[in-house]
Amino acid sequence: MRVTSATCALLLALICSVQLGDACLDIDKLLANVVFDVSQDLLKEELARYNPSPLTEESFLNVQQCFANVSVTERFAHSVVIKKILQSNDCIEAAF
């Protein structure tokens, strides 16, 4: 089954929605890592930083699988969606 970029956007929005403080706004860094296909270890480390609870192997694999199934073009396209989410009032208010 192919995962759509919308699904990836929702996953990142979910990660963002559970964040406090700077982590919500810093998700741009995570997004850049995903777009440019960094190593699994680095991606896992970055995801762990944004997750207030220990990142489970299952949750990491879900996110990793999501991004493994979309093209670089799609990753850039949904990055715009995530940036809009990050700039929304809900996300900004969570940072304060």
UniProtKB/Swiss-Prot annotation:
Compartments reported by the entry: Secreted
Gene designation? SCGB2B2
GO cellular component labels = extracellular region
Any stretches that span the bilayer, and where are they? none
* Location (main, coarse): secreted
| Name of protein | Secretoglobin family 2B member 2
- Signal peptide position in this chain? 1-23
Domain of life per record: Eukaryota
What are the alphabetically sorted keywords of the record? Answer: Secreted, Signal
Matches recorded under Pfam families: Uteroglobin
The cross-references to Gene3D superfamilies, in alphabetical order and at most eight, read: 1.20.920.50
Q: Which family does it belong to?
A: Belongs to the secretoglobin family.
SUPFAM superfamilies, sorted: Uteroglobin-like (SSF48201)
